[in-house]
Amino acid sequence: MSDRQQVTNARGERIAIVAGLRTPFAKQATAFHGISALDMGKMVVNELLVRSELDPKLIEQLVYGQVVQMPAAPNIAREIVLGTGMDVSTDAYSVTRACATSFQSAVNVAESIMTGNIEIGIAGGADSSSVLPIGVSKKLAHALVDLNKARTFGQKLQIFRRLGIKDLLPVPPAVAEYSTGLSMGQTAEQMAKTYNISRADQDALAHRSHTLANETWASGHLRDEVMVAHVPPYKQFIERDNNIRENSDLASYAKLRPAFDKKHGSVTAANSTPLTDGASAIILMSEGRAKALGYQPIGYIKSYAFTAIDVWQDMLMGPSYATPLALKRAGMELEDLTLIEMHEAFAAQTLANMQMFASKKFAEEKLGRNRAIGDIDMSKFNVLGGSLAYGHPFAATGTRLITQVCRELKRRGGGTGLATACAAGGLGAAMIVEVE
């Protein structure tokens, strides 16, 4: 049996990435304060359709993701369909795979095209860290259910008497991994210690990311893939990511204190991604349908892979597991790639993965390979900056990476690119695209 992955439909046509778009990414409680993930999702999908001059009625499926779920609209995908002029019969469902969510939505649409069930679909994701599902304590939740069944005033009074003042306080969304109790920042700190990653190296990577992202915005390269967002009350607009340090100074990074291990730590707010609001989406078609409609795709999906590892130790190593599998399925080696886009959740996590890419020992012991994945050529790596600068709305990052690497390859005359990410739960994702 061949290890090669055939990302084609029954007619042998490739899966085309026709277009991609995102909102600007904004730090928590800034430009998108009060704007829900659903509203951002509708905003970007509608603008993507307008820019692409694609009739919404032609969309056969929309798969969309959200990590921080809102009880009021649990199926964000269906609400986007109903809010953007698509046919009411358009298939729509929501997915979640932590920080790899829109990798999953993209693959789901691609596989629907591969099986011949559809010809055109939209994938993406959105998250808001500013509009959050604030919960209640377990005791209050229990009491509220009992109140629905209580018939007399006396019964209701007895229920209220079970509650203390603390039970009435709101409960913010959990930031820790359910299985381990560790936050992502604590996991990054764990990885920094495991792989002996210095504070200086983490700060240097963050500085590089901000510097390159600022240069990219100044060059105008992102204007066609980042929309101008107008938000209520429509007196202001946002047209650029607001986390990027325009005058990044490496020396200033050293001034920040560790955020997760106050005494011995090295992970700080400056070398981590901030809580971020934003949305992104891509249009996928069969190669034949794209050609028939007159589109010139920005890229094609060559291979993809998802992996999972143990959550107790260094669980943000997803790229080191998913990338070699995607490369194998594409019949490629790391050195064959033109560009590499790796999600920078934390500088420590990114550097740990880069280190393991180059490790023969890791390849032998963890991957069952007789050679390392390969040394990363920094002239190919996150050449426009990464998540440390742009920010990280959890469900939106995957399709941001896919669009960005495709468009940059297009500017360079084509080639192949890797987009890869770690994710909570020990998950990993990787996709290889080819651009003509």
UniProtKB/Swiss-Prot annotation:
Catalysed conversion reaction: an acyl-CoA + acetyl-CoA = a 3-oxoacyl-CoA + CoA
Listed EC numbers: 2.3.1.16
Superkingdom, natural source: Bacteria
GO annotation, cellular component aspect: cytosol
Enzyme class: transferase
GO molecular function, one term: acetyl-CoA C-acetyltransferase activity
Role, per record: Catalyzes the final step of fatty acid oxidation in which acetyl-CoA is released and the CoA ester of a fatty acid two carbons shorter is formed.
Similarity field: Belongs to the thiolase-like superfamily. Thiolase family.
Assembly, per entry: Heterotetramer of two alpha chains (FadJ) and two beta chains (FadI).
Name of this chain's protein: 3-ketoacyl-CoA thiolase
Recorded name of the encoding gene: fadI
